[in-house]
């Protein structure tokens, strides 16, 4: 049986707390005010009180600045007594995120 290998990240994760707003939960509508645990140019690990399903679509917006993105839930892991860690892949980012991709032509 052939071995399967997980795809490797092209962007490094940086431990950073960024205040964000999450919305788009299918079961529990509304906006959740929360924070990231780490970030990259193409996504973030976010703490949530809600359990999300893999491939759910959500909207993430930074509380400071103009960043907003439609995202895909890559994973949702249970955290002890504090909710869930949600891996978010940015699908349609708009505005200035805290870190830019090395391939971003507008990067300074």
Regions found by a protein language model. Give the residues of each.
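Structured alpha-helical
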Residues: 1-108
């Amino acid at each position: 049986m052939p071995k399967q290998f997980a795809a490797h990240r092209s962007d490094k994760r940086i431990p950073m707390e960024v205040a964000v707003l999450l919305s788009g939960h299918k079961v529990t509508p509304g906006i959740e005010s929360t924070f990231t645990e780490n970030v990259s140019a193409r996504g973030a690990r976010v703490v949530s009180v809600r359990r999300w399903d893999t491939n759910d679509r959500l909207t993430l917006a930074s509380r400071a600045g103009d960043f907003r993105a439609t995202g895909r839930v890559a994973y949702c892991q249970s955290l002890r007594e504090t909710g869930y860690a949600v891996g978010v892949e940015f699908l349609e980012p708009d505005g200035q995120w805290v870190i830019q991709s090395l391939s971003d032509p507008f990067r300074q």
